[in-house]
């Protein structure tokens, strides 16, 4: 496929293969959800209403559903017949509503209820919550799970404003702006900014909030509130200010966060107005607050400007990682300036480049471990779901693409005006990779940079497998200490007796992760004697005592890949127990693979069986595949 042949299109011609709906036939003017949460039945029921414009004189409305009970359908408030077609794996069951009259404007309503097979929801019994006061519910609709919560055009190509009305016995949050409501156990929200279905979110439980900035509140269960507030209150407003300077004003008004129970499968989910986040961020050292910078960046990349299909997911995540690192660098620069450092801009760039080095290492590792077809920037998802293809590729290869473009186009001074132009041009819209490239030409050609863009190997970047066709030149000053210590361990025989806990005492968290990650890679290529691993454990005992999940995961990855441990060993048992406390797939999936591949497959399966009920449906399904339990 030639990328240049697909450029110069006002609207994307990409057909989303992950939806069974006829979304191209309609414009959604307004969406409304009227919901009822039942903790007794463990379901959500209600009515969804769409105000539509018929764009092509279409004679039927086809919506996505997955394991939903459909009770009734209405067209312009009149009950009509509907057909729920046979399930078409893995994308669900199309709901077909025939239109007796073809009119330009119409209103469709569907009464529905979720079932026990709903992949978007997790109900948690109160005994399993931290406060043990009441049951808990939360949703995760990305990528194509909204269709299991309510009938919808479940594609990022379709965006509309939403109104939410919810009845629940417990405090409820949704992805909109709260509206005052006097009805008991009733909550209302408005989302005036058009969003796709995957950004619809709900959480209900024993929740309390505390300020973490002038326009930000953190919510969580009351026993955890003070810890969550401390973790984020230092940085949240700084992140917002730097992001606004980079792009343009934050227009969602409030940026709030909900710290969920441990079964939440992701680091964070960028639900508008209320980021859902994992409790693994509460590390008591503010080292994981970078995830909040990432989710905040989604307020522009992903939420305002959206990939039109999941095949172009890198447009969401590559841009977001790029912005995240610019935000982290900007905050570091600001703090250096406050300390009176003269070269404060350089201080910020060091931080940005160090984060990029970690990302590049993750990218190289990921390429080695996933099917090659998923290492492309633009995926083919005709027969698989986005969850099957999900990895760090769209994040880190996408970032590398943007960093490469920044580099060849003349650095941030040249790239930043384009960035602002891009996010203004596609605000409230969805686009594909070819429109992105066309916008580069539109912006830079008048500036005399057409030859630079013509020299880019677009086809290899978008469709090539493996690592990118580009070796980045990052500032390695913060990384060099880590590399030096790694190299010292590589020459263990010459340096025996020269290691001590003080080697790593001054490291910040990301330096620990780089040291452990590069040492793991080194030892994977040339495995040292068991004595080396014993010395590591003895000298760097602080790693064994860590409470930071990133360090726990990296440390165990290093040790267990030695294949020196049996299932009965304490280190293995401790790691297996820890897996039962983390539902975040970043840790759960590689953790179970680690047990399976380097310790004992039966232990991995037994551990998963033991903790399976604690995990979110998405995590549970992916770990089952990883362990070969679905074959």
Curated annotation (Swiss-Prot):
One of its GO terms (molecular function) is aminopeptidase activity. It comes from Meyerozyma guilliermondii (strain ATCC 6260 / CBS 566 / DSM 6381 / JCM 1539 / NBRC 10279 / NRRL Y-324) (Yeast). Keywords: Cytoplasm, Hydrolase, Metal-binding, Metalloprotease, Nucleus, Protease, Zinc. It catalyses: an epoxide + H2O = an ethanediol. Its main location: cytoplasm. Belongs to the peptidase M1 family. Its cofactor is Zn(2+). InterPro entries: Aminopeptidase_N-like_N, Aminopeptidase_N-like_N_sf, ARM-type_fold, LTA4H, LTA4H_cat, M1_LTA-4_hydro/amino_C_sf, M1_LTA4H, Peptidase_M1. Binds 1 zinc ion per subunit. GO terms for cellular component: cytosol; nucleus. The keyword Nucleotide-binding does not apply. One of its GO terms (biological process) is peptide catabolic process. Substrate binds at residues 140-142, 265-270. Zn(2+) binds at residues 294, 298, 317. Its EC number is 3.4.11.-, 3.3.2.10. Aminopeptidase that preferentially cleaves di- and tripeptides. Also has low epoxide hydrolase activity (in vitro). Can hydrolyze the epoxide leukotriene LTA(4) but it forms preferentially 5,6-dihydroxy-7,9,11,14-eicosatetraenoic acid rather than the cytokine leukotriene B(4) as the product compared to the homologous mammalian enzyme (in vitro). This is Leucine aminopeptidase 2-2. It is found in: Cytoplasm; Nucleus. The active site is at residues 295, 395. The keyword Metal-binding applies. Gene3D superfamilies: 3.30.2010.30, Neutral Protease Domain 2, Peptidase M1, leukotriene A4 hydrolase/aminopeptidase C-terminal domain, tricorn interacting facor f3 domain. It comes from the Eukaryota.
